[in-house]
Amino acid sequence: MPRSSSISYQILPYGPNAWLLQLDNPDDIAALHTLRKASFQHIQECVVAYDSLLLTTSSPLTQSQVKALVHDTLQKHTSPDNKQRHHVIEVHYTGPDLQDLATASKLSIQEIITLHSSAIYSVRFLGFSAGFAYLDGLPEPLQLPRRSTPRPKMEPGAVAIGGKHAGIYSTPSPGGWNWLGNTDYPLFHPDRNDHSAFTLHPGDTLEFRPIS
């Protein structure tokens, strides 16, 4: 079981010239994105999944060689500048789905707000639109199905939940998640063309703070 700094993982054969890096702790997701963004020899492609990374090599490598490449790359690219950040996001809990969620969950609206805002969430990955972050950590009583009929448009800053995840819509888009409220917290900066275009990154943590 290799370790790089405090990150523990396994590297498993996954077909010709392919290897699967499987995290022992899914919360170390930031390491997978560090590898994906890094440029290192012999690796042709990196595909990030929920808690694993598929590495395709440009030529046959042994398991020991792949382990060494991964270890060296993580050591080189994991620095204080790459530390995970914590965000506090203020939310106006006035979303149009609060009452429906209260009925479905048999909770009061205030109980929903309290549950949602008392959790600490981690950014698992960025999803279907620019800057949209899938968040782990949603309390179990709020893990409810998405809407049966998606809305044609969710506003930027819409704070929502769907299934096991929470999320914040970063751009106007259709959406079937349950809309709890809105935030002015900037998530997407289209004028930037590097990683700073997105405020949230895999491995970051956040909490929601109710405001009136």
Regions found by a protein language model. Give the residues of each.
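Glycine-rich active-site loops that engage anionic ligands at enzyme catalytic sites
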Residues: 2-212
